[in-house]
Amino acid sequence: FYILEYGKLFDELIEVVKEKIANGVEVFMLIDEIGTLNRLPKNFLTDMKNIGVKCQKFQGLTSGLLHNNRDHRKIAVVDGDVAFLGGVNLADEYVGKKQKYGIWKDGGVRIEGEVARDFAKSFCAMFSLSSKNIRCPKIDEDKCEKIVGDGLAKSLFFTPSCVGEKTKAECEIIGLIDEAKTEIKISTPYFIPDDDIQEALQRACDRGVRVKIFVPGIADKKLVNLVTKSYYQCQLERGIEIFEFEKGFIHSKNILIDDSSILVGTINIDYRSFFRNFECGVIVKNSRASRQLADDFSELEKSCKKIEPKDLPKTRLLIKILRFFAPIL
């Protein structure tokens, strides 16, 4: 997990973990040291060790790695057969037990079977990278693309790369956008698209696809929110519709294509997710999950304000300044 903080959610989780450890279950935990900075006590790793959790911090401040590359993934895998992933971290605001920014809108997906093992393998690889002394159990190699339930699922894992290069994350998202025939819906807490994403959205609009972007109405990071708003005008001019969630903060990272194909994961539409972070996601096509996400977007739109030209920022100089800093936020 990228963020972990003591609170009601973690207390409930750790009680279950203690019970499972007592029954002989091995528990491994990997947290990002930057994401958890100032959220956990210094003796957290010792506390976890004392209850039997094998816990490591990813790319700590004392490591020789460039700590600006963060492990932004949120994954929980059970027995290598069930995986949970999405936007939810292990902190109370993510499940509505603490309201810092109004209503917290988040989401994720549960997957079972062979695709879940891909996430188990990914976790073990990152855990081994962070720990010289502890190794995860070996996971059998499997193909990435599998039948899950009533649809087709594909696991996605993204690593940092150089700004200016088209990344795997971008290629997957652009591929979905280019497949769209009728409608694209995207929810993201931060909308700071680079040229490749903007060009893909432009192509979609040019062929008559309706594009809707859902972003927070209440910001958790004011500067990043201002940068997001700086992209409103050019998107509206393309014919893209932008909706702000008036009741609070959208943290879900979902893409829905033609009410059929979905991408759910940890990937924001911004430079950090595309170029700086380790991220993950899953593409699911023609499944019950697609229909559930379509219903969720419909409900979300009812709680949103549609952005009109009169709502756009007026200061062009401010927009230019904010855009300059977009790649490093």
Give, region by region, the residue ranges found by the protein language model:
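Charged, low-complexity intrinsically disordered terminal segments
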Residues: F1-L329
